[in-house]
Amino acid sequence: MNFIGKILGFIIGYRFGGLFGGIAGLILGHIADKKLYELGSVNSSFFSKKITRQSLFMQTTFAVLGHLSKAKGRVTEEDIQLANNLMSQMQLDVANRQLAQNAFNRGKEADFPVREVIREFRIGCGQRADLLRMFLHIQVQAAFADSNLHNNEKELLFVIAEELGLSRFQFDQMLAMEMAARQFTQGGFYRQQQYQQQSHQQYNQENYQNSYRTSSGPTVEDAYKVLGVNAGDNQQTVKRAYRRLMNEHHPDKLVAKGLPKEMMEMAKEKAQQIQAAYDLICKVKGWK
């Protein structure tokens, strides 16, 4: 809840008008708080008439996850468990967990209007590219959770990407980046139980280095794909790409723009992948 308007209204009203002035200020402050809340909310014809951006992001995420699960032909127990695990990892309260479950179930329906839902989501997010890419990142991670990307899943992911404003080339490039990034976190957020223990902790370079160790280990070619650069690019070009991606996936900035705080660990994981890829390139190239 927002109380700033009420508090300021009462203080100012009381100072200039005593008790009655304070009460009047409290009422005006309440109206101001309500207006400010509405400015931070959006319309949604699918979920509810008025919804916060954070709730829109969360519910759209699970609705599309449900639709993505159905794209393979049928929703398996593993798909349902994956969604439930994600809800647990996000530490959703009872009310939000129910919203997420309802959204997932609605997404499984044959007549789920995926394009319409994504269009509303894009508008609701203010068409912020970083938020939209984070949303797509989550969906791609889910599709790869079983280490196998079904053709129908890939085509649905492109439909989502297209509605978010990406071209086929941009989508294919992002898919390659995401596939390479998985090498730096042993399969992605959905298979990383340790992130539950690391919630809300400050990560550092040691965490980055430890987080991407796999049985085979990521290659420098994977690192180039994660940053979207070429092997022949100079240090300035690579650093520019690294800084741009880190800025786009900064957890605190994403939350401030509308990413639910419960999804901050996903943003942290993406930042870890980017950092680990950059560190590996610098090590191989001998860059300081």
UniProtKB/Swiss-Prot annotation:
Entry protein name: Co-chaperone protein DjlA
Primary localization class, coarse: membrane
Function comment: Regulatory DnaK co-chaperone. Direct interaction between DnaK and DjlA is needed for the induction of the wcaABCDE operon, involved in the synthesis of a colanic acid polysaccharide capsule, possibly through activation of the RcsB/RcsC phosphotransfer signaling pathway. The colanic acid capsule may help the bacterium survive conditions outside the host.
Keywords carried by this UniProt record: Cell inner membrane, Cell membrane, Chaperone, Membrane, Transmembrane, Transmembrane helix
Lineage: Bacteria, Pseudomonadati, Pseudomonadota, Gammaproteobacteria, Pasteurellales
Cellular compartment(s): Cell inner membrane
KW Acyltransferase (keyword) present: no
Transmembrane portions of the chain: 7-30
The record's note on its domains: The transmembrane domain is a dimerization domain.
All copies of domain J, residue ranges: 222-288
Gene Ontology MF annotations: protein-folding chaperone binding
Residue ranges that the Swiss-Prot or TrEMBL entry lists as coiled coil: none
PANTHER family attached to this UniProt entry: CO-CHAPERONE PROTEIN DJLA
Residue spans, topological domain Cytoplasmic: 31-288
Gene designation per UniProt: djlA
An example Gene Ontology CC term for this record: plasma membrane
Complex formation: Homodimer.
Keyword Transmembrane helix: yes
Pfam family, one: DnaJ
Segments on the Periplasmic face: 1-6
Topology versus the membrane: Single-pass type III membrane protein
Organism: Mannheimia succiniciproducens (strain KCTC 0769BP / MBEL55E)
